[in-house]
Amino acid sequence: MAGNYFGTDGIRGRANKFPMTAEIAMRVGMAAGLSFQRGSHRHRVVLGKDTRLSGYMIENAMVAGLCAAGMDVFLLGPIPTPAVAMLVRSLRADIGVMISASHNPYYDNGIKLFGPDGYKLSDEIEERIESMLDKDVELTLADSDGLGRAKRVDGVHDRYIEFAKRTLPRSMSLSGLRIVVDCANGAAYKVAPEALWELGAEVVAINIEPNGFNINKECGSTHPAGLQKKVHEVRADIGIALDGDADRVVIVDENGAIVDGDQIMAMIAESWHQSGRLAGGGVVSTVMSNLGLERFLGDMKLQLHRTKVGDRYVVEHMRAHGLNVGGEQSGHIVLSDFSTTGDGLVSALQVLACIKRQGRPVSELSKKFEPVPQLLKNVRIAGGKPLEEAPVKAAIEDARNRLGKAGRLVIRPSGTEPLIRVMAEGDDPQLVEAVVNDIVEVISETRSAA
C-alpha cells in the first residue's frame, strides 16, 4: 500500500478504490488516533460527513480505526465541513474528521482532518500520519479495556446554526430579502435554509433532497445555472450556491450574474477596511486569483498575499501574518474572526450584511473591479509527469516570454483530480487564449505519446 495518500485537501479518490477503501480509512483512523493521544484523559473525535452513499462505508471504517486506537467518536451525521471545525473546539475534541470530496461527484469521497484547535493539519502532521499507514500500527493500539466508544450527538445542527447567526450583529435582520439558496444536495441541506430563515429572510431552497447520488449533480457552486434560473424565476435579491460540504460559496446577483470568490473577497475586504476591522493591511489568496483583485486592493493601499492553491495554505499564511480575510477564486472564503476554515454560509452572511448596511443591490456592490482576461483549461492525464517533459517545458517558457510583465501564467497538477491546470491572464485576451491553447496542445500530445 505504499504511496502518497494526502493531497492538497486531505485524502481523496474514487470510493472503494485506492486510496478511498474501507481498509485505508480504518488505518487512517488508527494512525490519526494514535497521533493525537496526549495526556491521560479520554480522547475524543468528532466525525461528520456529507451526503454521499459511500459516506456510510468510510464512516464505519474510520470509527473502527479510531476506536481501536482508544478514541471515543462523536458521530455528527451529514453536516458542513466548517461545522466540524467549529465542533472540534466546542466539544473539546482532540481531532475532527470530515468525510467528503467537497465539490466532486458522488462517486468520489475523501477524508479531511482537523486538529484540536479547529485548523486543518499541517503538511508535517499529515506526513507523520501518512508514514504510519504502511506500518504495523496494530502493535501500539489500545488494550481491550481501553477501546473507544462511538455515539451519535444530538443538536449539532442547532449549534452550527447559532454559531453562523452570531457572525452578524444581533440587531441585524435579513427581513425584506428574498434569497435562493442552492445546497447542492449536500451537507448544508438542512442548516443553510434554516439559518437564513431564522435571520428573517424569505428563503427559497433548492437541491435539498440528497439521495446519496445527486450531491453536486448539475447544482451547487460548480454548476450555478439552475440557481441563476431560479433567481430570475422568483425575482430574488440574491442567490447563494454552496458546494457538497458547504466550505465554498458562489453568489448570483439579482440579474443572474455570477459573483466569484475574488469579487466576494473584494466586497468583504472593502467593507471591513472601511469599518476598521480588516487586519494586517491586506488579503490572502492563491496564485489563481485574478490580477484585477490585486490592483483593486492596491488602490486602497492594501496588499494581496498569494499562496499555492489550497485553502489550508491560505489559512496558514493568514495565521502567520495576522490577516483576517482570505480565500480562493473558487469560493473558499476564510474569515478568521469567525472560522478556522472556509465557510460558505458565514461568507454569504457577510455579503448579506453588506447589502443590508448599504441598501444597494448585489449587482452594484459586487462590481469592485474589472477582471483581467483570464483563461483556465484542464488537461486530463492518466499518470506520469508531463510537466517535466522537454516539449512542455519549452512551451511554458515560450508562453512566459510572450506574456512578459503584462500577464501571469500558472501551470500546476491538481491536488484532488488527475488533471493539469493551465491558467493564463493578461490585458490582451487573444494572447491569453493563444498561450493557454498552445500549452494544452503540447501537454495533450505528450500525454498521447507516453
UniProtKB/Swiss-Prot annotation:
Q: Specify the signal sequence span.
A: none
Q: Which reaction does it catalyse?
A: alpha-D-glucosamine 1-phosphate = D-glucosamine 6-phosphate
For this chain's record, the cofactor binding note is:
Binds 1 Mg(2+) ion per subunit.
- Name the Gene Ontology biological process terms: carbohydrate metabolic process; peptidoglycan biosynthetic process; UDP-N-acetylglucosamine biosynthetic process
Main enzyme class: isomerase
Please list the residues that make up the active site: 102
Output the CDD domains linked to this UniProt entry.
GlmM (cd05802)
Q: Does the keyword Cell inner membrane apply?
A: no
Q: Which cofactors is this protein said to need?
A: Mg(2+)
Give binding positions for Mg(2+). 102, 243, 245, 247
Q: Which PROSITE patterns match?
A: PGM_PMM
List, in alphabetical order, the Gene Ontology terms for molecular function in this entry: magnesium ion binding; phosphoglucosamine mutase activity; phosphomannomutase activity
Q: How is it modified after translation?
A: Activated by phosphorylation.
Modified positions (Phosphoserine) in chain numbering: 102
Give UniProt keywords alphabetically. Isomerase, Magnesium, Metal-binding, Phosphoprotein
Enzyme Commission number(s) of this protein: 5.4.2.10
Identify one Gene Ontology CC term for this UniProt entry. Answer: cytosol
Q: What does this protein do?
A: Catalyzes the conversion of glucosamine-6-phosphate to glucosamine-1-phosphate.
Homology family: Belongs to the phosphohexose mutase family.
Q: What is this protein called?
A: Phosphoglucosamine mutase
- Annotated organism of origin: Mesorhizobium japonicum (strain LMG 29417 / CECT 9101 / MAFF 303099) (Mesorhizobium loti (strain MAFF 303099))
Q: Which gene encodes it?
A: glmM
